[in-house]
Structure formats: C-alpha cells, structure tokens
Amino acid sequence: MPKKVLIVDDEPSIIVPLQFLMEQNGYETGVAFSGEEAMETISVSHPDLILLDIMLPIIDGFEVCQRVRENPEWNDIRIILLTAMGSEANIAKGLALGADAYITKPFSNSEVIAKVKELICQ
C-alpha cells in the first residue's frame, strides 16, 4: 500500500511538479490550495506526510502545522515545511511548532525526495 503525501501550496507551478515527483517515486498524492482545504483533507485522508507551504490564504502553514500537532490522532503525520521564507526566525518557528523538516525554495527534487523517504521510511 503506497504512502500518502499531501501537497499544500497555493501555486499550481509548485504543486504540479511536486505531485509528479511524488507519484514517480511510488507515493499516492493529494493536493490542497489553502490551509483551510489542507485541514479538511487531513481529517478525511490522514496522509503519512505533508509538504506544506507557509504563505497560504486564510490559514497559513504555521497554523496548519500547529493544529496538526495539537491533534493526538495525527501524531504520526510527518510535516515538511517547503517555503521561500528561509530566515532563521521562520525556520526556528516552524520547527518549534512541530515540523519535522524545513526546506527552502528554490529546492532540488533530490533534496525533497530524500527527506520524504527519510521521514516516512519507504
């Protein structure tokens, strides 16, 4: 049974190549274009890992990360923040809120897939 990866970003130009990359590596994918949509998708599909942008409409990625970590039913979900917000303060905040990893844009496909594999052991 393939592992599920939820890709959360408001830019289709980011989502499409990430979705292709994940599927080429054997992962089932889901997509959300906002933090609000991400929360709904997480509650329905319970992904194994979330690739999460920070700058999202309505509910930002930091808040999504925090909400996931506050729900004990979702303790097993791994979170990678994948964002252009690469300042040390943002990295520290993301990790403090419970993200498992923080990758800054622009990123390499090999960097992303290596981190995904590391976190969900596939």
Where do the protein language model's features map onto the residues?
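Two-component/phosphorelay signaling modules centered on CheY-like receiver
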Residues: 12-30, 119
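Acidic, metal-coordinating helix/loop segments flanking the phosphotransfer/catalytic sites
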Residues: 31-49
